[in-house]
Amino acid sequence: MMSVWFIQLAIFAQSRIIEVFPEQGKDIENIALALKKAADCKGRPVTVKFSPGIYQLDRAKSSQVLYYISNTTSELDDPDPTKHIGLYLNTLKNITIDGCGSTLLMNGEMTSFVLDKCEGIVLKNFNIDYKHPTQTEVEVLEEGNDYLIVQVHPTSQYRIVDAQLEWYGDGWSFKNGIAQSYDRISEMTWRSWSPMENLLRTVELRPNVLYLQYKEKPQVGLHTIFQMRDSFRDEVSGFVNRSKGILLENINFYYLGNFGVVCQYSENITVDRCNFAPRPGSGRTNAGFADFIQVSGCRGMIDIKNSRFIGAHDDPINIHGTHLRVIEFLSDNRLKLRFMHDQTFGFEAFFKGDDIELVDSRSLLVVGKCKVKEAKLVTPREMELTLSSPLSSEVMQQKDLVIENVTWTPEVRITNNYFARVPTRGILITTRRKSLIEGNTFYGMQMSGIFVADDGLSWYESGPVHDLTIRQNTFLNCGEPIISIDPENREYKGAVHKNITIEENYFYMRKNSSCAIRAKAVDGLMIRHNLIYSLDTEKNKESDFIQMYNCNEVTIKENRVQLHHLFK
């Protein structure tokens, strides 16, 4: 009877539609059954259509699958990287999930969706939210000499045991952790002291109103909002793995789990008209544990457009590859490699036929190139590569080498997006292929609006930029340098990046800020036709706002400086 009333298969002309209806207590089972029917179409185009409503996906009924995901958590912090998945698509093709305005409500610490080895998948027209977000929020109602009185957001669950405060939900809890502060007037956030630090005693004055006592006077302002979390990225909001031809369209990500949407070794991904921000009217000010979109080791075109990114705890968009360190030459054509950063390991980073570059991690310059004949993940931390040709003795004698997978590097377009309420950067990008950042607005980034990196000794996020245009963007009240090109080369032996154009942008400088653009180790840099609005009457020429270090073939021309009075 359930299949008749809650899942219907209809054929109109040559299209197939599988309908899903909300049913209390059975939503996750009904969705799984609809996806099974879609899989039975064997790659023929099919739409899974949700009847409008709220679908609650419970952690206890989720698909539990082990995944190692870039930039998440270490094996010490999370010995079991099993993900609890609400919407699970595995080896499926040509399927559209149309939410028709429905909400997928996660109940517990969960990964809202996974697309694994899929092709031609469209997710559109729905909302993703969490019943009890893993980031809690409180607002300061009163401050005294040794106390705060705070209002707890209704979605934040707490318990008080022996006068000690603990936040909790299904699958998670924390007592200490990390905090970020939000100011309603300036519409800005920053990393800050946490009201959980040095907390002596907690008393519940009434439901969701707490008295927090300290040894010393808390240095906070009235109506400050604290966003608190632990540091463990043991789930992600979404995971696109080894997939291609993926479209995320018109999705409201009201909350993004313990990390954002991670795209890993996938190709041709489009994000269009998506909203990464708290639900309007919810009273929440934060929408994400860390990054909103993390693109790691992808290829093809990454196209992110017409979207809003508001309320992250880290960079809203981060696009990079992964440097693995050479730890042993097994022979002249066999290498042992290691994932070096605690949060990134466990997945295949190289495949047969891939082009690779061996890189001096201190200078970030290429010392050798080759093709992969065979690749094997021997442990979650180590890979072995067999190369198609032997390496020279000169290369094998070098120390501190890392390897980038050149085949898995994407083209990028990031256009017509809005970024706000972010304590870090707006966009971090390191890819060698043609990239365009155009028509975006960045408001109140506490660090750079755009950051061009590359490193082989810290985060091990690769690689060099070879063709990047930053055009017609507006930067309002951002940290400096507003555009930062700062590869982490410890020794300068030549340019790391090349062919970067920064043109026709609008920079509205904040008070006491004097660096719009800072560039390091670039060959071929064009900075032209930008308009810099300054609060400083003594700085009135372009050279006052542009800094260069070890750059060659630089053209700086026709940039104007004007006074403004927006951010005094």
Curated annotation (Swiss-Prot):
It comes from the Bacteria. InterPro entries: Beta-barrel_GLAA-B_II, Beta_helix, PbH1, Pectin_lyas_fold, Pectin_lyase_fold/virulence. Residues 1-17 form the signal peptide. Keywords: Glycosidase, Hydrolase, Repeat, Signal. The keyword Lyase does not apply. Its EC number is 3.2.1.n1, 3.2.1.22. It is an enzyme of class 3 (hydrolase). It catalyses: Hydrolysis of terminal, non-reducing branched (1->3)-alpha-D-galactosidic residues, producing free D-galactose; Hydrolysis of terminal, non-reducing alpha-D-galactose residues in alpha-D-galactosides, including galactose oligosaccharides, galactomannans and galactolipids. Belongs to the glycosyl hydrolase 110 family. A subfamily. Alpha-galactosidase that specifically removes branched alpha-1,3-linked galactose residues present in blood group B antigens. Has no activity toward linear alpha-1,3-linked galactose residues. This is Alpha-1,3-galactosidase A.
